[in-house]
Regions:
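Non-catalytic nucleic-acid substrate-recognition regions in nucleic-acid-modifying enzymes
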Residues: 1-40, 48
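Short, charged low-complexity linear motifs
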Residues: 23-30, 58, 116-119
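Generic structural signal for hydrophobic core residues of well-folded globular domains
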Residues: 27, 44-49, 85, 89, ...
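P-loop NTPase catalytic cores that bind/hydrolyze ATP
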Residues: 32-46, 83, 203, 207-210
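Short coil/turn segments at secondary-structure boundaries
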Residues: 32-40, 52-61, 93-96
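Extended, well-ordered alpha-helical segments in internal regulatory regions
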Residues: 48-52, 170
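SAM-dependent methyltransferase catalytic region
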Residues: 59, 63, 67-240
Length: 240
């Protein structure tokens, strides 16, 4: 939240505070470790308002638009789309022709492009008429820059950051490997140079910013909690 957010002015009665603390303490650790937990929580929080607007029969105005149009992407869909774009770029760079002609399984090819903290489990390989493996997703990367420092990724409806957090977690190890960067430096450069997002829901943008920050702070050997570069994500309002 912003430092001047009204949320910091809210004071709960002690009994309500204890109820809330008990609810939080009962949440499984896996929920806290998931980068998209806050986003899904916010979507469920908005579901009542969304249903009320949809059932009212009234015209949807700019104030109602964020709640009505909010629909976050399931993790496997995010992974599939990124694996067959960024993953295809990485596989095309890593896999020499001899591997594509000699490797006997799709799993073997995926293992050849894996790095610590990186895998592309949804990346698809297919076999051509000559029994050579090829990467169908290569068509998605035509025109991509050779250097990842020049790659600009934008999610124009980024919500709470599901896509940009996932691609952050895949770009960091790739840039570490290619550019021989430390984890801390790679995290900073991916935030500064690669990932961008726009969103009409101001609260979602705040959640997205926190999700990216949390991913960077939690990244192994990246310095933990620290000041990060400014994020290239913005609340675009409803003026367009």
């Amino acid at each position: 939240f912003r430092a001047d957010s009204p949320v910091f002015e809210v004071e709960l009665p002690p009994e309500k505070q204890r109820q809330l603390e008990n609810l939080v303490s009962d949440i499984e650790n896996e929920v806290f470790n998931a980068s998209d937990s806050l986003g899904w929580t916010y979507q469920y929080w908005q579901s009542k308002k969304k249903n009320e607007i949809n059932n009212s029969g009234n015209k949807v105005g700019d104030k109602e638009l964020p709640a009505v149009t909010q629909l976050f992407t399931e993790p496997y869909m995010v992974e599939y789309l990124i694996d067959n774009s960024l993953g295809a770029w990485w596989a095309n760079r890593c896999l020499k022709k001899k591997y594509l002609s000699s490797e006997i399984s799709e799993t073997g090819l995926q293992e050849r492009i894996s790095l610590p903290n990186l895998n592309f489990d949804y990346l698809k390989f297919e076999v051509d008429d000559n029994n050579y493996w090829f990467i169908p997703g290569v068509d998605n990367i035509l025109g991509w820059p050779e250097s990842l420092s020049e790659l600009k990724v934008i999610d124009p409806a980024c919500g709470s950051g599901h896509f940009i957090v996932t691609i952050f977690l895949k770009l960091v190890p790739i840039r570490m490997e290619i550019e021989k960067l430390s984890a801390e430096k790679a995290c900073d450069l991916v935030i500064r140079e690669n990932i961008h997002g726009l969103e009409i829901d101001q609260r979602c943008i705040e959640i997205a910013a926190f999700a990216i920050a949390l991913a960077a702070w939690k990244y192994p050997n990246a310095g933990g909690f620290r000041k990060l570069p400014d994020f290239n994500i913005a609340w675009c309002g409803q003026a367009i």
